[in-house]
Amino acid sequence: NTDSLRQPDARLRALNAEASTAGPRQLVYCTKVGATRPDEMYLVGAHMDGIGWGEAANDDGSGTALVMELARVLSAPDVTTERSIRFVLWNNEETGLNGARAY
């Protein structure tokens, strides 16, 4: 198969998963410390959970990718910021914004 967009077979696969899962809230974060006002902070965040396959790619896979890319670019040693920037990824947004509330 030379078509990179074609699936290896025509069968549809489904993931059996609950839309809501009980358990602890989790988050991942890193902080770029500001040069002149380190105690003042911007938050750049997104949630890691999603519902469905295609929908989750945008809600919020695209946001997660953006936060990670911003963290990568702004972490370069030659990039300085006046204020600190915290890059945060949390879960349980799809169950009522619980991850962000817990943060």
Identify the residue ranges that each predicted region occupies.
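Soluble metallo-hydrolase cores and metallopeptidase-like ectodomains found primarily
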Residues: 1-56, 69-72, 76
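Acidic/histidine-rich catalytic neighborhood of metal-dependent amide-processing enzymes
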Residues: 24, 50-103
